[in-house]
Amino acid sequence: FFEMSNGEINSTELVAALINQKDNLIEGIQYALDTVDGSLSMLILTPVGIYAARDKMGRTPVVLGKKEDARCACFESFSYLNLGYENDRELGPGEIVVFDEKSCRTLVAPGDKMKICTFLWVYYGYPSASYEGVSVEKMRYNCGKLLARRDNVDVDVVAGVPDSGTAHAIGYANESGIPFSRPFVKYTPTWPRSFMPTIQQKRDLIAHMKLIPVHDLIKDKKLLLIDDSIVRG
């Protein structure tokens, strides 16, 4: 669920209020997971350790990492791999654990209903991330391969809409034998995700300013462009 924008209450305050409805932290976390109509995963820092809970349907990941005398939890494992941590495991749907620097203990066992968000692989996930043992980059590459097997088109080059469309395009190009090219490059320092604004004119402006054409790779060419998804029609 989204943080409320009127400044009166936000999602963290709301979840904390739900947890406080019960007599102890574990019952409170379970109550919050059951009450919220949607996905809710959380980390709670306490004096005895960090409590981690994954939403009851497993839509959003929680992964655990470890190294000597240290443990961590986050949304994607790539965030800690360069810090010397290694993967421990992913929490299951509705699972609650508590961990400190030395150990991790399961407080509520995972459920058996997994409905992870497939958009993690298609768009949201960082290329080096994996969810439930499936690599984001490899999945996107394989999607491109399958598209190439289905198609029969006469084009000069294959290109992806950066960034998350790039792996799809490379898979397509390698499978089809059509050269891969980069006729568009992305400039991101000052422009956010183009699908997020609610006004179409703003979305058009962001897309226009963020994608910079390489005209020498476009002129007189037949291009096949692959994007990862169509969030808005």
Residue locations for each model-derived region?
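Flexible loop/turn segments at secondary-structure boundaries
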Residues: 51, 59-61, 80-82, 105-106, ...
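Extended, hydrophobic alpha-helical segments in both membrane/secreted and soluble proteins
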Residues: 158-160, 165-172, 176, 180, ...
